[in-house]
Swiss-Prot record:
The keyword Lipoprotein does not apply. Residues 1-29 form the signal peptide. It comes from Anopheles gambiae. One of its GO terms (biological process) is sensory perception of smell. Present in the aqueous fluid surrounding olfactory sensory dendrites and are thought to aid in the capture and transport of hydrophobic odorants into and through this fluid. Keywords: Disulfide bond, Olfaction, Secreted, Sensory transduction, Signal, Transport. Disulfide bonds join C105-C174, C152-C183. GO terms for molecular function: odorant binding. InterPro entries: Odorant-binding_protein (IPR052295), PBP/GOBP (IPR006170), PBP_GOBP_sf (IPR036728). It holds the Pfam family PBP_GOBP. This is General odorant-binding protein 70. The keyword Lipid metabolism does not apply. Belongs to the PBP/GOBP family.
Length: 200
């Protein structure tokens, strides 16, 4: 049952992650002129590694499910750390949290394969800016992305009390990666839709 849930959750997370990536280049009728005219290469870069990342995440989930299944009285449970102080794993309200976590693990994998993660497993400013601006020759877009990535990294560092000299645990990596991705997507969307001002 848990294995079936894990596979279902992985599929939902992949769809959610793919849909969110489409928002990274919202060129359309509502976009101001001379903004976001060129699509960044981030979608192509994700497409190149997403299948491999999906397989890695599925393998990890199956391994985790087997460990849970064979554990006596649930005393050994890696995922419990992630849900500490929260609701029981089987509670129905956890489903969206699980999907979010799996999508975050996918993004962490994508970031890792695009050199946007440091040696301790944390997303980096230079790596993320390079990933999200590759293929775009627009100063305003670059500056908006730089500001957005900086703000998002600072926000997640504060939220998760990140100490960058410490190695990130797997559950932390996934949650941080999702929040960083979600935040950067919002910032880029704000810029492309004209809700964020250019630097002149």
């Amino acid at each position: 049952m848990r294995r079936q849930y894990s596979m279902w959750a992985s599929t939902v997370a992949v769809i959610a992650c793919g849909s969110a990536l489409m928002l990274l280049h919202p060129v359309g009728a509502d976009a101001p002129k001379k903004r976001c005219l060129t699509k960044p290469n981030v979608s192509k870069k994700v497409d190149m590694v997403i299948h491999q990342c999906q397989e890695e995440i599925k393998s990890s989930l199956i391994e985790d499910a087997l460990k849970i299944f064979t554990a006596e009285h649930g005393q050994w449970h890696d995922r419990r750390k992630r849900d500490e102080g929260g609701l029981d794993f089987s509670h129905p309200t956890i489903v969206s949290h699980e999907d979010k976590w799996i999508a975050g693990c996918l993004m962490q994998c994508v970031y890792r394969k695009n050199n946007a993660i440091d040696k301790n497993g944390w997303p980096t400013l230079d790596g993320l800016v390079s990933l999200y601006t590759d293929g775009v020759n627009e100063q305003g877009y670059f500056m908006a992305t730089l500001r957005g990535v900086d703000r998002c990294l600072k926000g997640t560092s504060k939220k998760y009390q990140i100490k960058r000299n410490d190695a990130a645990e797997n559950f932390e990596q996934c949650e941080v990666a999702f929040d960083v991705f979600d935040c950067i997507s919002d910032m880029i969307t704000d810029y492309c839709s004209g809700q964020m001002e250019d630097d002149h």
